[in-house]
Amino acid sequence: MEGKGTENPCSRTLGWFHQDNDAKPWLWKFSGCFSRPEQTLPLSSQTKEYMENKKAAVELKDIPSPLHVGSKFFPAVPLPDIRSLQQPKVQLSAIPKVSCCAHCPNEPSTSPMRFGGGSGSSGGSGSLIHTGSLLDSPSTGTVTCQVGSGFAFQSVSSLQNASTRNNLVGLSSDFPSMCVESNLPSCKHLSCCGKLHFQSCHSNVHKLHQFQNLQGCASAGYFPCSDFPSGAPGHLEERLSHSELTPHLCTNSLHLNVAPPVCLKGSLYCEDCLNKPARNSIIDAAKIWPNIPPPSTQPAPPAIPVCNGCGTKGMEKETSLLLATSLGKTASKFGSPEVAVTGQVLETLPPIGVFWDIENCSVPSGRSATTVVQRIREKFFRGHREAEFICVCDISKENKEVIQELNNCQVTVAHINATAKNAADDKLRQSLRRFANTHTAPATVVLVSTDVNFALELSDLRHRHGFHIILVHKNQASEALLHHANQLIRFEEFISDLPPRLPLKIPQCHTLLYVYNLPANKDGKSISNRLRRLSDNCGGKVLSITGCSAILRFINQDSAERAQKRMENEDVFGNRIIVSFTPKHREFFEAKSSNAIADKVKSPKKVKNTKLCLIKDTSEQSPSVKAMPGKVLQANSGSATKTTNIKSLQELCRMESKSGNRNSDHQQGHGRLAALPNSGPTASVPIVKNTGVTEPLYRSSQKKENPSSQSTVNSPVEKKKREETVFQVSYPSAFSKLIASRQVSPLLTSQSWSPRASPLAFNIANPSSGADCPDPFANGVDIQVSNVDYRLSRKELQQLLQEAFSKHGQVKSVELSPHTDYQLKAIVQMRNLHEAICAVNSLHRHKIGSKKILVSLSTGAANKSLSLLSTETMSILQDAPACCLPLFKFIDIYEKKYGHKLNVSDLYKLTDTIAIREQGNGRLVCLLPSNQARQSPLGSSQSHDGSSSNCSPVLFEELEYHEPVCKQHCSNKDFSELVFDPDSYKIPFVVLSLKVFAPQVHSLLQTHQGTVPLLSFPDCYAAEFGDLEITQDSHKGVPLEHFITCIPGVNIATAQNGVKVVKWIHNKPPPPNTDPWLLRSKSPVRNPQLIQFSREVIDLLKTQPSCILPVSNFIPSYHHHFGKQCRVSDYGYSKLIELLEAVPHVLQILGMGSKRLMTLTHRAQVKRFTQDLLKLLKSQASKQVIVRDFSQAYHWCFSKDWDVTEYGVCDLIDIISEIPDTTICLSQQDDDMVICIRKRERTQDEIERTKQFSKDVVDLLRHQPHFRMPFNKFIPSYHHHFGRQCKLAYYGFTKLLELLEAIPEILQVLECGEEKILTLTEVERFKALAAQFVKLLRSQKGNCLMMTDLFTEYAKTFGYTFRLQDYDVSSVSALTQKLCHVVKVADMESGKQIQLINRKSLRSLTAQLLVLLMSWEGDAYLPVDELRRHYETTHSTPLNPCEYGFMTLTELLKSLPYLVEVCTNDKAEEYVKLTSLYLFAKNVRSLLHTYHYQQIFLHEFSMAYNKYVGETLQPKTYGYSSVEELLGAIPQVVWIKGHGHKRIVVLKNDMKNRLSSFDLFSVNHEDQPAVSRQILAVPESHLASELQLRTGTGPSQMEQELLHLASSSPVDLLCAPVPSCLPSPQLRPDPVILKPADLIQFEEHPQEPLGVLVLNQEEKSEVPLPVQKGNLSCDSSPSSPAASPAPPGPSSEAPRPLFSKDAVESPAKKQPKNRVKLAANFSFAPVTKL
């Protein structure tokens, strides 16, 4: 009958009982229980003779005082005045007498009662007491009103009312202190608690009158009664026979006027409070009495007894009676689960033993085992004494935190060997047998297990020993086990809503003390010594002294508090100091916190990261802060919103450390509550315990996001609302100290916040959930360091990291990851979390070597979140056959896939995800059935019905059985599944159009309720649409089974009986507008080994005819193709078919039986065709192909005939339509369809960014071995190398391959099977190699290296071997010939030696090229070859770029990007042009050539430039703000000298050479018309001479003037008037370096400018000057007269080059030295007419 009780919840208020005149005798008054000398009770005459000479049942000294301060943990709530219900106040006698209640019989005899023992109908061993004699005894000072009998009462189910204590085996077992009476016509009266219902009354009709409402019940949280059998409100009438009579229990002495209150461990409680749910938490108490101040230490006046539970007041007559019980009994702590019975020894309680199979019913991972133990004790231990509490497990395999919590709870943990079979069960069975031998009935056994092996022991304990058996089991318990238990309870009730384990102790953080009123006239060292002596015994350290204040640091809060007491008001050099935890001013606080550890840390960055406990006085707290101890801040794991209020980890460290001072307040019950800045009535308030995160978080959000919320929060109305609404946030992770500041949603700080809008789930949690767990960072904190400079040696790098991190705390270890692909990382382990946070905040982006390291916290394998481990485990096991893997294979796959070690003990914590089973000689990791269904790769947003199908072509679904054929259309009516031979099935090959076939299949599925068996599909199709076009030649068709899977939304599933069924993917037709690609599955494979295997399968099947291969031929074909064996066990499988089915996104198995075929899936075929099509289109010159010519183009590109069935379809259009529109473009030209690559026109900015990207690619690949890298490594390597993402849209592309193909001059993409390799082009490779050779040779002694040592030194320097074949050479000598611009080979005695060549200065060459380009008239591009020719003509020396370190002149010009622009036209011709800035410089040079000495005042430059060029000078068009900045940007042309207004713009000497564009750029002479030019401006003192000059042969105007003036007397030149507008000449000598010559014959050899025809004025004849042989000769125009012989002179005998080097350097040297030798050369302005 146990556990079968029913409930009838009541809701109507029950009033006070009144004893009217017609009231029945059992309705007795409360005051009638006590006799007084002045008042004779109505029944005293009838009971007096039975109350003599009887021993007292309860001594007054055993009754504790109900008004004891310790017993009143919470004061009672105010109650309404009930004086009208009390009897007149009378003086009680010293020895009170108690009369029998109305339940006692009226006749002279009463039935005897058993007291103090028995239970059940058989009674117990208690003494027999006659109530009459007991109450009549004048010498007793006892209160022994007993109500009810000793019969067992029917209990309410403990599952429904766990905390109600009405499940009485016997009255003496639960309430042995209550006196019991027996009355045959009795009625069981129960309180109006809502959980109980009125039982049947005896045969007499009892009438309950309308009662007043019970204020006490309402305040205590009771639910009033409502349903009465009679239907009348407030009345109850029932008739019952004597056979239905049950004993009655008056449960509330105050409400039902039955018995005095029951004393529980020294506190006074009525029965209603005993039946209430247990108050195990202060949270519930705070919820019931939210506004009650802390209890007063003054004892309350003992006027009226009040129930400590519900607060109901009793009669004043009870005062003296209850006062008599307060004889010094010390009250126990409130909330103890045991029922303390006055005058009874604990050993008389029945024993109870708990036996816990913790391996079978385990504590959920990360949850508190303390709470589970507490819940077990609270539920079962009332009225019992704990005799045994044991759990059995392997302590080496169980979580250490769980074992520690069990030990702390005084639970016996028995260790067994987990590898031994049934070791835990055997140990528990032994403990059960010992318990039965030790204890006798009545006793209770609680077994926490689901193992059926305990059925035998439970049967014996219940039926042979008479024990009460309680079984706590899981859902999967066996009926054989459940049958032997008296009471069944699900284990999930104990583990539901378990709080997470939190660290047992918070890591210590430093605490600051601020010292004020220090003497200002003393030096800091003396004050520091004095303060150190005062604080040394408390572990203090003086951080800084500023003015009259100082800061001291202590290791924890306790030391700081002790130091504050000792140092307060101490004398320091005559001043009484003041010590405080908080600074006086905010500015002082900010200043000191930034200089807290200045003596240790010098860097300003590191100073900011001091971990300190910053403590505020209570006076600075907000008035809304409310004391609420016992709360724990917990955050929901579902929220990942990062708050914007926490700026850095340093702030988090400060806020976390603030909890240090508040811990003591929490212990005293004065915790602080941070109110949310929310003005709404639904504002929630997180409660903080031991963490200082929430308060600063919301305080900062109040200041930053809601400035107006401060006054709102401080309002009394809002304070009350916030105090009444209390929530908690649950943090399941042990990393909650860091996540707390990140996962609190910003919505919490919004004024319109509501619980529905918040992403956080707020739950009221049991305070026991706050039980701390061991610190997850007790063994150290791992810090991950990335972006490490891989150029440093490992030893050097390890030392640098050790030094950097040791400045912030103790470094336990520094580990470097393997040096692969230059992705070098480091793991630094520090001692505690605080030091790690400070190190992360300080060293993030700290430069070590040549890179800025990236630092972040890493929990590592030991601290990895179990939820993440569960997800990773599921992803691996879901790809495994039967979702199981051997443990060693699972560990190997896990570590290869995720790159870190796996702690096997963590796997045992995933009890809700996996199961580890012993099998044979090893362990097997299996996924539980509830987690085996793979989630849809499309996601819930793309899935039509939320199906978990993975959309693979071959799918095992929940089809337990399916008919092998369609009975309606199958042609073979005699088909039998038993007779059918799978090997006889022949796969049909069809030739159909997919566009026609797809709607037919959907229609066929519609008529067949969504499924069609594959065997009868041809028959069903023929019945609907006619016969299929089946071909007998398998090479000319497509397998029907594969062709069906090409239809979007249709799949072929395999039922569990092996029948293949055609069905819809989502069990219904797809929507009409669904993208076909959404119906294709993504790769479900996550195992790197399987990914590699899938690539190998694709590569193998591509070589097979029609991409079809029999399964039986796979192994030999694999061996023949790859030259290696295919070991199935290497992938974790035992059968080949299981391995093939593990890659369903790539491989499709066709047919059945032993003749199965394998082919590529349609998804893989489309991907393969797309790659081939793009390759074909890129091979075309026009990047397009006509469909009509597709076969021919395919043959030219791939050297094989086109066969569309190779790609699994029958029509080209079918597979082209599967390619996304973003990849190719189909267009119609005339009557033909054209396929082309879709390209988007890129903007000019994107083109410029692509050019910069090409430079990045060169830089990246130069750091890779052999200047190449895999394609799939490019993105991570780019991110790691440059510290930024490679965003394709930034360059105008959508695919990485397209971006890389856009720089063909830099990068090549090589295809090696399925893999793509990126490598530099040949030109870029040689550039990179040249840079390596320069670096290598410069590191050698003498910048040279023996040729034989080249390979060895190269490998030592760069870490990989040198390969000659990469450069298409066979020897080092041939290689050096290609690097002749960098190295040269010298023959030495010891052998050939490689040496660096001496490069010429590029600066002088740059100036010479600039002069050439600026002297050329025009803005158009100039061919590079012509520029070379003009250079060689001008300077009479070949231009060899190798001498300057470049292979070609184009590369040399590209190295000058700010001077010139180089471009290439469609004919691959290279042109060069000045940049816009140097076009401006060209104009400046021309302008300055018109001035004396090529200089001009700066303030006159703009006006002169405007007049000369004809346009206004705008510096902003060139990117500069002023003319001075603009001129400063062309230092190769001009420079500015002087100061203030006298600043002068001067032309550089290199730019003073004036070369005529007609003279220099004489190209294609025969194609250019003759042009004549005259010199018109000459001085008046001379005759005007007309000089006819041919194109390209005349000098510049200045040179002509100089030549003409040279023939005159120098006196005329010196005597010519100087214009007054010209500035004063600044004479400075231009030294002439004379070559060795015959100075005596100086006058006999006048120098004439070469290449110039001087016309004699008289003869008008041409005088050709000789030209050096080998240079370009000047052709005479057809209109010119015949050339006359040259005048006699040595010039005709000794010809000179066309332009001498001296002539180029200085225009003054071009003057013929004929008559006068000037002391210095001067620059001349053009001679103008005065």
From Swiss-Prot:
Organ and tissue specificity: Predominantly present in oocytes and barely detectable in granulosa cells (at protein level).
Residues recorded as bearing Phosphoserine in the entry: 65, 1081, 1083, 1684
Entries under Pfam families matching the protein: MARF1_LOTUS, NYN, OST-HTH, RRM_MARF1
Domain HTH OST-type: residue ranges: 865-939, 993-1069, 1089-1163, 1165-1241, 1249-1324, 1325-1400, 1401-1475, 1476-1550
GO molecular-function terms, A-Z: RNA binding; RNA nuclease activity
NYN domain mapped to chain residues: 352-489
Cellular compartments annotated: Peroxisome
Bias (Basic and acidic residues): 655-668
PROSITE patterns xrefs: HTH_OST, RRM
Region (Disordered): 655-722, 1667-1714
Alphabetized UniProt keyword annotations: Differentiation, Meiosis, Oogenesis, Peroxisome, Phosphoprotein, Repeat, RNA-binding
Record's GO cellular component terms: Golgi apparatus; peroxisome
Assembly and oligomerization: Interacts with LIMK2.
Stated name of the protein: Meiosis regulator and mRNA stability factor 1
Source species: Mus musculus (Mouse)
